Amino acid sequence: MNLPRLLIVDDEMSVRESLKFVFSKGFSVFEANSLETAVAKVKEARPAVVLLDVLMPRTDGIEVLRQIKAIHPGCEVIMLTAMNNRQLAAKATDLGAFALVGKPFDVVDLLAKVNSALAKTAAQEKVALPQT
């Protein structure tokens, strides 16, 4: 059985490891700690869902979101942020983010959002399949 692919993009190893622990049983998990690595992983792995930190070194999560959506528009991106910023939320939503989740995050809430995002990608794939 092929597990759905999940990409975790965060510059903090402890966050990536925690999220990998949470999601490794139901997902094929990939990690990236930078914009360059994230873009390469999206091209290579074609994840269904990306968990993306908003604050990244040398760039911000909004720029990473832009590039992910350009490469793989069907991918659902959940932004992780320690900031409570309405302007950021609006911009992320306008660029196609599925959701914003505050740090520290509630694992149950994050799992629910990832499952909802996965359901959306599955529904989009069914719609995209040609009828025979």
Task: Locate predicted features.
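The feature encodes the CheY-like receiver
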Residues: 57-58, 81, 85
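Two-component/phosphorelay signaling modules centered on CheY-like receiver
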Residues: 13-30
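Short amphipathic alpha-helix used as the core "switch/output" element in two-component signaling
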Residues: 40, 62-73
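Acidic catalytic/metal-coordinating carboxylates
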Residues: 33-37, 60-63
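C-terminal output helix
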Residues: 87, 105-114
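Active-site residues of response regulator receiver
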Residues: 10, 53, 81
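Active-site beta3 strand of CheY-like receiver
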Residues: 45-51
